[in-house]
From Swiss-Prot:
GO terms for biological process: translation. It comes from Triticum aestivum. Keywords: Chloroplast, Plastid, Ribonucleoprotein, Ribosomal protein. This is Small ribosomal subunit protein uS15c. InterPro entries: Ribosomal_uS15, Ribosomal_uS15_bac-type, uS15_NS1_RNA-bd_sf.
Length: 90
């Protein structure tokens, strides 16, 4: 283990201390929502871009499944996230 500038390096892995937890359900839903909004605005301009439309549908499905998981595990966090992202409840 080498220490370099406040980071721990294990071979190929660099581990840094960060405030957000990128593996959390909330962060993943937030990330998917940003991608969904970006793709939706792209599809308004390019209506015949069917590969992007397919990607949008995949992202919608992933977000729906993550939200269903969060609603089942912790309803309070689910309601808070829905309110923050301004998306409909399922």
């Amino acid at each position: 283990m080498k220490k370099k500038g406040g980071r721990k390096i294990f071979g190929f892995m660099v581990k840094e201390e960060k405030e957000e937890n990128r593996g959390s359900v909330e962060f993943q839903v937030f990330s998917f929502t940003n991608k969904i909004r970006r793709l939706a605005s792209h599809l308004e301009l390019h209506k015949k871009d069917f590969s992007s439309e397919r990607g949008l549908r995949r992202l919608l499905g992933k977000r729906r499944r993550l939200l269903a998981y969060l609603a089942k595990k912790n309803r309070v966090r689910y309601k808070k996230l829905i309110g923050q992202l301004n998306i409909r409840e399922q």
